[in-house]
Swiss-Prot record:
Residues 82-85 are annotated as: Involved in Mg(2+) ion dislocation from EF-Tu. CDD domains: UBA_EF-Ts (cd14275). This is Elongation factor Ts. It is found in: Cytoplasm. Belongs to the EF-Ts family. The lineage of its organism: Bacteria, Bacillati, Cyanobacteriota, Cyanophyceae, Gomontiellales. Associates with the EF-Tu.GDP complex and induces the exchange of GDP to GTP. It remains bound to the aminoacyl-tRNA.EF-Tu.GTP complex up to the GTP hydrolysis stage on the ribosome. It comes from the Bacteria. One of its GO terms (cellular component) is cytoplasm. PANTHER family: ELONGATION FACTOR TS, ELONGATION FACTOR TS, MITOCHONDRIAL. Disulfide bonds: none annotated. Keywords: Cytoplasm, Elongation factor, Protein biosynthesis. The keyword Protein biosynthesis applies. The gene is tsf. Residues 221-263 are annotated as: Disordered.
Length: 263
């Protein structure tokens, strides 16, 4: 097996236009033989993808995918160079596959590793450095272990590094490169958003044991005695005494004239 040097990888890249990592993998798969490596890249559809990678992609398609049950939804924008390709059924099928891929990857947050904010990288590094498994190890060993963990963790966040759901032998990035070779245009995933029903809403978790105990206690508790309100006896009404009127003076009957004459 020929030694796979940086110079050999560069030669293969110049001949095929494929990416550096693809060229290195092709040489590894073919024992370092240049012609076989070229054929390997052509079979994977990667031989001409690198030459188109820098072209402007101003056309494309925004597509959606709603997973069965309506609990997960995806919106994705994939760009290409011309409106003609944007209407192509192969391109539309690619965009739909990418949308389904995003729905199937709950950890994916970015398109590529270049989009990960430095603050996120530093946070992940701090977490890796604080691992108990690294205690007592030399610093140079720690750095290698942390770097390996970092690469794995960060790639899990990136769409292009995920194994394709329909063919685990290739990544999403390789799938796109195959599409570039097939369509003859540069293709790029620009952005996406993944929705999960109820995400971000805090739901109170009921403790079943406590709930059952509360129900039993409520049934066993004696009924509460409620005192009937005492009706207030109304005070008897006091009748008002009418004011006494002065007694009328009795007048003596007047004597008749006939009585006076008899005397």
């Amino acid at each position: 097996m020929a030694e796979i040097t940086a110079q050999l990888v560069k030669q293969l890249r110049d001949k095929t236009g494929a990416g550096m990592m693809d060229c290195k993998k092709a040489l590894q798969e073919t024992g370092g033989e240049m012609e076989k490596a070229i054929d390997w890249l052509r079979q994977k559809g990667l031989a001409s993808a690198g030459k188109k990678a820098g072209r402007l992609t101003a056309e494309g398609l925004v597509d959606s995918y709603i997973h069965t049950g309506g609990r997960i939804g995806v919106l994705v924008e994939v760009n290409c160079e011309t409106d003609f390709v944007a209407r192509n059924e192969a391109f539309r099928s690619l965009v739909q596959d990418i949308a389904k891929q995003i729905a199937a990857c709950p950890n994916v947050e970015y398109v590529s590793i270049d989009e990960i904010p430095p603050a996120t990288v530093e946070r992940e590094k701090a977490i890796a450095m604080g691992s108990d498994a690294l205690k007592g190890k030399p610093e140079n060993v720690k750095e290698k272990i942390v770097q390996g963990k970092m690469d794995k963790t960060l790639r899990e966040l990136c769409l292009l590094d995920q194994p394709f759901i329909r063919d685990q032998s290739i990544t999403v990035e390789e799938l796109i490169k195959q599409a570039i070779a097939q369509l003859g245009e540069n293709v790029k995933v620009r952005r996406f958003v993944r929705f999960v029903m109820g995400e971000g809403i805090e739901k109170e978790e009921a403790n079943l044991a406590e709930e059952v105990a509360a129900q039993i206690a409520a049934k066993e508790a004696p009924p509460a005695v409620v005192e009937a309100p005492v009706a207030e006896t109304p005070e008897p009404a006091v009748a008002e005494t009418p004011e006494a009127k002065p007694a009328a003076t009795e007048s003596k009957p007047a004597k008749s004239k006939s009585a006076k004459k008899k005397k």
